[in-house]
Curated annotation (Swiss-Prot):
Pfam families: Ribosomal_L35p. This is Large ribosomal subunit protein bL35. HAMAP family: Ribosomal_bL35 (MF_00514). GO terms for biological process: translation. Keywords: Ribonucleoprotein, Ribosomal protein. The gene is rpmI. One of its GO terms (molecular function) is structural constituent of ribosome. It comes from Enterobacter sp. (strain 638). InterPro entries: Ribosomal_bL35, Ribosomal_bL35-like, Ribosomal_bL35_CS, Ribosomal_bL35_sf. Belongs to the bacterial ribosomal protein bL35 family.
Length: 65
């Protein structure tokens, strides 16, 4: 049986936490930032957790995480 390949794009975007969840960076903080409010940018700064509905997809992409 061959090894399962890790989806490299997912490996760069998600990190596993101690409890088994996955954290990721929020979107909308890369460019065109002048028109976005400081409060909005501040709230986008901390990492977010992958929702329960998407968790299975992330686990399938990262078999060895």
């Amino acid at each position: 049986m061959p090894k399962i390949k890790t989806v490299r794009g997912a490996a760069k975007r998600f990190k596993k936490t101690g409890k088994g969840g996955f954290k990721h960076k929020r979107a909308n903080l890369r460019h065109i930032l002048t028109k976005k409010a400081t409060k909005r940018k501040r709230h986008l700064r901390p990492k977010a957790m992958v929702s329960k509905g998407d968790l299975g997809l992330v686990i399938a992409c990262l078999p060895y995480a």
